[in-house]
Amino acid sequence: MIDISNMNLHLNHKHVLKDITLKIPISGEIIGIMGPNGAGKSSLLKSLIGSFNASGEMNLYDKSIHKQLQYITYIPQKAQLDLDFPINVEKVILSGCYQTIGWFRRVDHASKMKFHKLLRDLDLESLQYKQISELSGGQLQRVLVARALMSDSTVYLLDEPFVGIDFNSEQLIMEKLQHLKNQGKLILIVHHDLSKAEQYFDRILLLNRTVRFFGPSHQAMQPQYLNRTFLFNVTSTLKEGSDISND
């Protein structure tokens, strides 16, 4: 169980997150986090992993979540990465297993087998030795997901994983996330495309600095909850399938 009580976050004298209270069981679920630009979606994920110093209580398995980070894997936005760093696809993905096997230890046989399966499943075999600076947006996102899946985490936090990627990459990633869900993992995804929300998510957290709605995806897509969150009529936007936020 992730148990958040009265979370508040101030950044640069701005009240970014206000009185966030949530209880989320670890029971095999994909949850979308949606809201307008500046709503605090990315800040919520960063607060959970301790990158931002939010107040309030944040617990995982009845202990401070910041002391339980071995159970959590975080995938940042691609824009936050240093793509000029000289490292190839293989090394990026294998770095994900150190959380399990420990740093400065040789990659064991089981991890190598898992690595090669991820290469196949995410269509990365031909890119194994390419530098990350040579990859397209979709290829890079598949590499980041493969790296995350090398760990044996319980909770996966993904910040805008589908921005700027091709349809095939998006589908391959969703297949792997569904597999994680079927294993009982919890996946939280910051997302912006309303047209795919019901298809991708079991539940949706609508956020605009505070919780506007949290519940089944089909209910979250009702106009009264969307309008309350985005503060304008989003019906036409939903019909068009437009991207409406980027935070």
What do these predicted regions represent?
Residues 109-127:
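Conserved ABC ATPase "signature" region
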Residues 131-135, 139:
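Conserved ABC ATPase signature
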